[in-house]
Amino acid sequence: MEEASEGGGNDRVRNLQSEVEGVKNIMTQNVERILARGENLEHLRNKTEDLEATSEHFKTTSQKVARKFWWKNVKMIVLICVIVFIIILFIVLFATGAFS
C-alpha cells in the first residue's frame, strides 16, 4: 500500500516539477521578449534622434535656399524696374527734343 501511495506521490511531484519547468520556460521567454523590446525601443529612439537632426538640417538648408531665390527675384525686379525707367526716360527725352 505504501508503494502505491509513494508512486502516486512521485507522479504528483513529477507533474509539479513539469509545471514548474513550463512556468520557468514561459518566464524565460517573457524576459527575453522584454529585453528584445527594450533593444527595439533603443533602436527606434536612435532612429528618431537621427531623423530629428536630419530634419533640422533640411529645414535650415531649405530656408537658405528660399532666401537665396528671394534675393534673386528682388534683384531681377529691381533690374527690370531700372530698365523700364531708362526706356521711359529715353522716350520722354526724345519726345521733348532734348537730343536735338
UniProtKB/Swiss-Prot annotation:
Keywords for the protein's UniProt record, in alphabetical order: Acetylation, Antiviral defense, Autophagy, Cell membrane, Coiled coil, Cytoplasmic vesicle, Endosome, Lipoprotein, Lysosome, Membrane, Phosphoprotein, Protein transport, Transmembrane, Transmembrane helix, Transport
State the membrane topology: Single-pass type IV membrane protein
- Residues on the membrane's Vesicular side span 97-100
Q: Which domain of life is it from?
A: Eukaryota
Post-translational modification (record): (Microbial infection) Stearoylated By S.flexneri N-epsilon-fatty acyltransferase IcsB, thereby disrupting the host actin cytoskeleton.
Query: For site (Interaction with STX8), what residue positions does UniProt give?
Result: 33
N-acetylmethionine found at: 1
One Gene Ontology term, aspect cellular component: SNARE complex
Where in this chain does the entry annotate a coiled-coil region? none
The residues on the Cytoplasmic side of the membrane are: 1-75
User: What are its GO biological-process terms?
Assistant: autophagosome maturation; autophagosome membrane docking; defense response to virus; mucus secretion; negative regulation of secretion by cell; positive regulation of histamine secretion by mast cell; protein transport; regulation of protein localization to plasma membrane
User: What positions are modified (Phosphoserine)?
Assistant: 5, 18, 55
Q: Name one Pfam family in it.
A: Synaptobrevin
Q: Where is the lipid attached ((Microbial infection) N6-stearoyl lysine)?
A: 64, 68
Gene3D superfamilies noted in UniProt: 1.20.5.110
Q: In which tissues is this gene expressed?
A: Platelets.
Residue ranges of the TM segments: 76-96
Q: Where in the cell is it found?
A: Lysosome membrane; Early endosome membrane; Late endosome membrane; Cell membrane
Which InterPro entries does this UniProt record tie to the protein? Synaptobrevin-like (IPR001388), Synaptobrevin/VAMP (IPR016444), V_SNARE_CC (IPR042855)
Q: Which residues carry this modification: Phosphothreonine?
A: 28, 48, 54
Task: Report the protein's function.
Answer: SNAREs, soluble N-ethylmaleimide-sensitive factor-attachment protein receptors, are essential proteins for fusion of cellular membranes. SNAREs localized on opposing membranes assemble to form a trans-SNARE complex, an extended, parallel four alpha-helical bundle that drives membrane fusion. VAMP8 is a SNARE involved in autophagy through the direct control of autophagosome membrane fusion with the lysososome membrane via its interaction with the STX17-SNAP29 binary t-SNARE complex. Also required for dense-granule secretion in platelets.
PANTHER family, sorted: SYNAPTOBREVIN FAMILY MEMBER
Query: How does this chain assemble?
Result: Forms a SNARE complex composed of VAMP8, SNAP29 and STX17 involved in fusion of autophagosome with lysosome. Found in a number of SNARE complexes with NAPA, SNAP23, SNAP25, STX1A, STX4, STX7, STX8 and VTI1B. Interacts with PICALM. SNARE complex formation and binding by PICALM are mutually exclusive processes for VAMP8. Interacts with SBF2/MTMR13. Interacts with RAB21 (in GTP-bound form) in response to starvation; the interaction probably regulates VAMP8 endolysosomal trafficking. Interacts with STX17; this interaction is increased in the absence of TMEM39A. Interacts with TRIM6.
Q: Which family does it belong to?
A: Belongs to the synaptobrevin family.
**What is the name attached to this protein's record?**
Vesicle-associated membrane protein 8
Q: Whose protein is this, by species?
A: Homo sapiens
- Tell me the organism's taxonomic lineage: Eukaryota, Metazoa, Chordata, Craniata, Vertebrata
